[in-house]
Regions:
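Portal/gating segments that form or line small-molecule/metal binding sites
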Residues: 1-2
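Conserved donor-nucleotide/metal-binding helix-loop-beta segment in metal-dependent transferases, i.e.
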Residues: 19-47
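Conserved alpha/beta core of the MobA/IspD/sugar-nucleotide pyrophosphorylase nucleotidyltransferase superfamily
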Residues: 78-154
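Short, glycine-/small-residue-rich phosphate/pyrophosphate-handling segment
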Residues: 58-77, 140
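Conserved beta strand-loop-helix elements of the APE1-like EEP
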Residues: 50-57
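Active-site rim beta-loop-alpha module in soluble metabolic enzymes
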Residues: 44, 55, 63
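Short beta-strand-to-loop acidic/aromatic patch adjacent to the donor-nucleotide binding site
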Residues: 9-17
Length: 154
């Protein structure tokens, strides 16, 4: 982060790659908030965060943060307060940390990423992928309702 700011950037947003509900609108809103706020935080439902927007870097922002815990977002928020920086909070979103999280996300009817859902369902139904990555517990019971998407076996 310090290198990014030293290269002349005056607004930086760090995003996680496991939050499938992050939208371009949220990113746009982040940079709009950074016009008036020093920090923007997008908390995740599991206690982490999916986005951190900054106008300047300070290593103390990450002091005493217990990474991969359920209090990461709260600890960063507390550090922001101790540094007397203004903070905008984004909507809380889910991130994907397990197969169950991915399955639940795929089953949401309100998810707008229909192309991604179709692609992931197709990928999950591929025999090689299922054997390598899908636990046996969910192989047939939960994925069989999507088998209609594939042509019948030859």
């Amino acid at each position: 982060l310090s290198t990014t700011f030293s290269n002349g950037y005056d607004q930086v947003a760090i995003i996680g790659n496991d939050c499938l509900d992050l939208t371009p609108e949220i990113l746009t809103h982040t940079f709009t908030e950074l016009e008036t706020q020093e920090t923007v935080l997008g908390p995740a439902k599991d206690g982490g965060f999916y986005l951190l927007g900054l106008r300047r870097f300070d290593a103390l922002l990450f002091k005493n943060v217990q990474w991969c815990g359920a209090q990461v977002s709260d600890q960063i928020s507390a550090n922001i307060g101790q540094l007397h920086r203004s903070l905008a909070i984004l909507p809380t979103l889910k991130d994907i940390d397990s197969y169950r999280d991915l399955f639940n996300w795929l089953c949401q009817t309100q998810t707008a990423n229909r192309w991604l859902i179709r692609y992931l369902r197709h990928l999950l139904l591929q025999t090689e992928f299922r054997q390598m990555f899908i636990p046996p517990v969910i192989r047939h019971r939960q994925l069989c309702r999507w088998k209609w998407q594939l042509p019948p076996p030859a």
